[in-house]
């Protein structure tokens, strides 16, 4: 039986929690201001991981429910947030879970919803939203080429020569297709940030990417060492420019 690709991050809960990138707080401020999330409102987070995009919703005072497929990730969420009275989580599959008629003012995800088949994702979200409720889909785009083109070329050469994964990323999800499923597109909003890593830090960060977690064993050492050595040759620093994006829809 083929292993569920959606569980790839569940194999590294502690590393995922430490090294996965957090979003710009301004993005979450925008979501709260636009959707009115707060006490008396309800929200559902699809696939929270270990809480990279959970604090703002929990701290808003809204009734927060997360649905997480990975049991180890769900355990990490409970460890971090179970002391909050408005925090709830189910370890289940969003595609099939019975929410018992519950409806939400906000449903959101951070780089998670694209792991669900598009028709299922949008249709279920539409059914689970209250009239006037919102869908917020967050993602991050990053690049390091502009800061150091020579380093970028060296790292790409390592990818070309050494990268061999058991799980290529082949998800197909269009963030602009919500209108086909009865949702009204509001806007796409972007925020920007910057981060730096040493060679060793970057190795840890890369190890949280789905395709890198699933690297073939014989490729792991030459690939990670090759990227690490390239960064060391360029001052032991790699700089990423990040774009934090949210696609916002409304029901009704």
PLM regions: where:
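Conserved catalytic/acceptor-binding region of the Class I
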Residues: 126, 130-195
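A short acidic, Gly/Pro-enriched loop at the edge of an enzyme's catalytic core
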Residues: 97-107
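Conserved Class I S-adenosyl-L-methionine
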Residues: 50, 167, 172-252
């Amino acid at each position: 039986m083929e292993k569920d690709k959606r569980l790839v991050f569940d194999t590294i809960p502690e590393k995922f929690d430490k090294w996965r990138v957090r979003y710009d707080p301004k993005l979450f401020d925008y979501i709260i201001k636009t959707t009115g999330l707060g006490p008396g409102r309800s929200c559902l987070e699809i696939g929270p991981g270990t809480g990279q995009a959970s604090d703002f919703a929990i701290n808003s005072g809204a009734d927060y429910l997360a649905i997480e497929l990975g049991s180890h990730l769900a355990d990490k969420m409970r460890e971090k947030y179970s002391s909050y009275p408005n925090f709830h989580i189910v370890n289940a599959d969003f595609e099939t879970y019975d929410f018992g008629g519950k409806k939400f003012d906000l449903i959101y995800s951070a780089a998670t919803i694209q792991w669900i088949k598009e028709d299922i994702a949008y249709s279920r979200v539409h059914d689970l939203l209250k009239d006037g409720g919102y869908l917020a889909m967050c993602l991050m785009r990053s690049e390091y080429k502009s800061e150091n083109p020579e380093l970028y070329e060296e790292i790409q050469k390592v990818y070309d020569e050494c990268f061999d994964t058991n799980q290529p990323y082949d998800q197909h999800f269009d963030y602009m297709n919500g209108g086909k499923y009865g949702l009204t597109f509001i806007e796409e909003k972007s925020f920007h940030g910057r981060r730096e890593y040493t060679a060793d830090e970057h190795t840890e960060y890369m190890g949280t990417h789905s395709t890198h977690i699933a690297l073939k064993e014989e490729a792991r050492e030459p690939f990670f060492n090759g990227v690490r050595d390239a960064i060391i040759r360029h001052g032991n620093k790699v700089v990423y420019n990040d774009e934090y994006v949210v696609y916002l829809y409304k029901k009704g």
